[in-house]
Regions:
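Catalytic cores of secreted/periplasmic or lumenal enzymes
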Residues: 1-262
Length: 262
């Protein structure tokens, strides 16, 4: 917020930003939206991405999220943010801020400090961070994309729709629900499922004393997750869920997204 850079202005369409390490695989999501952009050229990329995010969440069983429109697109890749301002899943962590965000952080083993540094800058608070992380209930991690997965395929992904394999955070990784949070609670109680992905920045949500109450609240009440738009700065969250929803969608879900946008 204090840098007046970044934000929802469609810069992900530029190769410069798609080339950032944290965005590996997002060319697939952008590619899915290109035919819609061509059909409706007057809609901005920024609005289209937000619409796709909302439609994808709804198609996955999540809430219907109201949207506001009128975002303007960046005119060139000169407006692409500096690489390194997104969070990592495991240490050692980079600074993720300032003029050299890819440089090692002095607290490069502190999971909670890392994600707070990233998301406080965006104006989010601890409750928002936990809610945002809940987007991991949808989607998978692949070796040739984020590289965050521990396994190339699991019981839940080896025969899934779309690209086979990868590792998901939940068993039903095309459903928008609170399983991500119940998985973290299970893990904290010793109920481990090695087929499910758990990053260091996931697990800290159930161990950090300030994150933990929100994680437990979402784990206890599915409806809290389905009312996420009332509990969080939802427009800040939508564009970050798009990767999971669009890149991991089945054909039925993709068609629903397109029908919502067309």
């Amino acid at each position: 917020m204090h840098t007046n850079t970044g934000g929802a202005k469609g810069t992900i369409r530029f190769d410069k930003e798609l080339g950032h390490g944290a965005n590996a695989g997002l060319q697939n999501a952008v590619g899915m939206l290109e035919p819609i952009k061509e059909k409706y050229p007057d809609i901005s990329w920024a609005d289209l991405i937000q619409m796709a995010s909302a439609a994808g969440i709804e198609a996955a069983g999540g809430p219907k999220i109201p949207l506001r429109f009128g975002r303007r697109d960046a005119e060139s890749d000169n407006e692409v943010p500096t690489e390194g301002r997104l969070p990592e899943g495991d240490p050692p962590y980079h600074q993720a801020d300032g003029e050299t965000p890819l440089h090692a952080a002095t607290d490069n083993q502190d999971h909670a400090a890392h994600i707070r540094r990233v998301f406080y800058r965006m104006g989010l608070n601890d409750k928002d961070i936990v809610a945002l992380s809940g987007g991991h209930t949808v989607g998978r991690a692949h070796s040739n994309r984020s590289g965050a997965n521990r396994k190339d395929a699991t019981l839940y992904t080896e025969n899934g729709p779309g690209t086979k394999g990868g590792q998901s955070w939940t068993e039903n990784w095309l459903e928008f629900d609170n399983r991500y949070f119940t998985m973290l609670k299970d893990e904290s109680e010793g109920k481990t499922n090695d087929d499910l992905l758990k990053l260091s920045t996931d697990y800290v949500l159930i161990t950090d004393p300030d994150f933990k109450p929100y994680t437990e609240a979402y784990a206890a009440d599915k409806d809290k997750v389905c009312k996420i738009e009332h509990q969080t700065k939802y427009e800040s969250i939508l564009s970050r869920i798009i990767a999971a929803v669009l890149c991991s969608s089945s054909r039925t879900t993709r068609n629903h997204i397109r029908s919502c946008l067309s």
